[in-house]
Regions:
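Short arginine-rich
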Residues: 73-79
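Short S/T/G/P-rich N-terminal loop/turn motif that feeds into the first structured element of a domain
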Residues: 1-73, 84-94
Length: 94
């Protein structure tokens, strides 16, 4: 398991469609393929143009496929709503 931070930049007015997919049965099934959804910590920018989430990832390749458009379930949604995304690996420090 790896802690990751994902930042998604959304197109203008796309937030509701993005969240509709992420909370749909299809979106949850796809997310469960790479992340423990019960441990996700989401946040939204005040203008709703950016979404970020701290994730506990168990399949990094599936996460990349979900975000980069190579997953056939998420690709149609991302084509409509996403401008860009960034992924950060989180490390604990003492």
């Amino acid at each position: 398991m790896q802690d990751m931070l994902v930042v998604v930049k959304l197109k203008e007015g796309a937030f509701e469609k993005f969240m509709g997919f992420m909370q749909s049965d299809a979106g949850i099934v796809e997310r469960k393929k790479f992340v423990d959804v019960t441990k996700s910590v989401p946040a939204v920018a005040p203008d709703k143009r950016a979404f970020l989430a701290k994730l506990v990832v168990h399949n990094i390749d599936a996460m990349h496929a979900f975000l980069d458009g190579s997953n056939p379930v998420s690709k149609p949604i991302w084509d409509e709503v996403m401008d860009s995304y960034e992924i950060y690996e989180l490390k604990k420090t003492s």
